[in-house]
UniProtKB/Swiss-Prot annotation:
Belongs to the SelA family. Pfam families: SelA. The modification N6-(pyridoxal phosphate)lysine is found at K230. Pathway: Antibiotic biosynthesis. Activity is dependent on phosphate. Its cofactor is pyridoxal 5'-phosphate. This is 5'-C-glycyluridine monooxygenase-decarboxylase.
């Protein structure tokens, strides 16, 4: 098979990306599970790539660039200031460090030893997630904090959070993700913000994969953390935005624990261009285009034996539309879990969203999926399942 046929993002002129992966012995991937750090984040637009290339050709005063980028991101999010970082996990460590050490140079350089500073970080047990295997509590510890989990995974009364706030509390943490964090019967963000205000304790929000760049700052959170690749289409990067004094404290950590977490000029200009492109498209337009695209794909996949396909909105209510695949084990000759393994085993390795395996379901997420990637998904599913009856679904089905 020609590498240009199976790699959805190869350069059509040279195939250089695929060839480089092959030279390294690395199998190309089609990500139908969204922009995922283990799968290389996101693919970049031509505009983002150009911005990174331009940055690579010149020297710059990085202090000035960080400040200017912070002002740009603050305007985009409606916050007082912003601090670029290498990603959401780094953002959590830096945000905690800012709440523990502030801008005091000696305290900054002593971290992760907090000394006599308040360093307890209160979070609901259902929000104690991991960043690709690295526990959130570990990121808190990197910033000099100590995670204090309250409640149970499936229920956290407001009184438990309020009672956990003491003179040793440095911040409250809230994770927005409905895929990774448990929100059922938990304390909603508005109530957490109220608790923080009552006790004079800042609230840190991990909004890594969220769109709506102004929503979380407007919620009253003091610091909000975003990932660059997850929703924005940026290279490996992220940023913290929010209250001016706390963002200044985040920036102060560049001389401490954040030294290995700073964004270089190339990724930083790529991030800014990605934000420009993301905010240029109205959310309603993006959702409508996504729904139309997934509706056409669902119609094709629904004709494959053993599969029932329909469009489904993100369970959290976000305007993200996917194809929901329900696998009939008898008709398909395998379970949803086995089908997911077989999709990953080929070339290219195709990753479907598998958070609903316990229901016998898989999902196709469009956010990281190119048109060529869609064809790879359809082709592989046909190859695996047509032995159990039915006929191939041609391109005409998508028209």
């Amino acid at each position: 098979m020609n590498e240009l046929e199976f790699h959805p993002h190869a350069d059509r002129r040279t195939g250089s990306h695929t060839m480089e992966y092959q030279h390294l012995g690395v199998v190309p991937v089609v990500s139908a599970q969204a922009n995922s750090t283990p799968l290389g984040g996101c693919t970049l637009s031509d505009g983002v790539i150009r911005a990174m290339g331009d940055a690579a050709r010149f020297h710059v005063d990085m202090e000035q660039l960080w400040q200017a980028a912070g002002s740009f991101l603050a305007e985009a999010t409606g916050s007082e200031d912003a601090c670029p970082v290498t990603g959401a996990a780094a953002g959590m460590a830096i945000a905690v460090a800012a709440c523990v050490a502030g801008t005091d140079g000696l305290r900054v350089q002593r971290l992760p030893d907090p000394g006599d500073q308040p360093n307890e970080i209160v979070l609901q047990k259902g929000h104690s997630i991991s960043y690709g295997g690295a526990p959130l509590a570990q990121m808190i510890a990197l910033g000099g904090g100590r995670a204090v989990e309250v409640g149970a995974v499936n229920e956290t009364p407001r009184s438990h959070v309020a009672s956990a706030v003491t003179r040793r509390t440095a911040a409250l943490v809230y994770v927005t993700s409905r895929t990774h964090a448990v929100h059922r019967k938990g304390v909603p963000l508005d109530e957490l913000v109220a608790i923080g205000r009552e006790h004079g304790v800042p609230v840190i929000v991990d909004a890594a994969g969220e769109g709506g760049l102004r929503r979380w700052v407007a919620s009253g959170a003091d610091l909000v953390i975003y990932s660059g690749p997850k929703m924005l289409g940026a290279p490996t990067s992220g940023f913290i935005c929010g209250r001016g004094d706390l963002v200044a404290a985040c920036r102060a950590q560049y001389s401490g624990i954040a030294r290995p977490m700073k964004v270089g000029k190339e990724n930083l200009l790529g991030l800014l261009q990605a934000v420009r492109e993301y905010t240029a498209v109205p959310e309603e337009q993006r959702a409508a285009e996504q729904l139309e695209r997934m509706t056409k794909l669902a119609a094709r996949l629904d004709k494959i034996p053993g599969l029932s396909a329909r469009t489904a909105q993100d369970d959290s209510g976000r305007t993200i539309y996917r194809v929901l695949l329900t696998v009939d084990p008898a008709a398909a000759g395998r379970s949803a879990a086995t089908l997911a393994e077989e999709m990953r085993a080929g070339i290219p390795s195709i990753y479907l969203r598998d958070f609903k395996l316990h229901l016998g379901q898989l999902e196709v997420d469009p956010r990281a999926l190119s048109p060529d990637g869609e064809e790879s998904v359809v082709r592989r599913l046909e190859e695996l399942l047509l032995d159990h009856g039915g006929a191939p679904t041609g391109m005409e089905d998508a028209r």
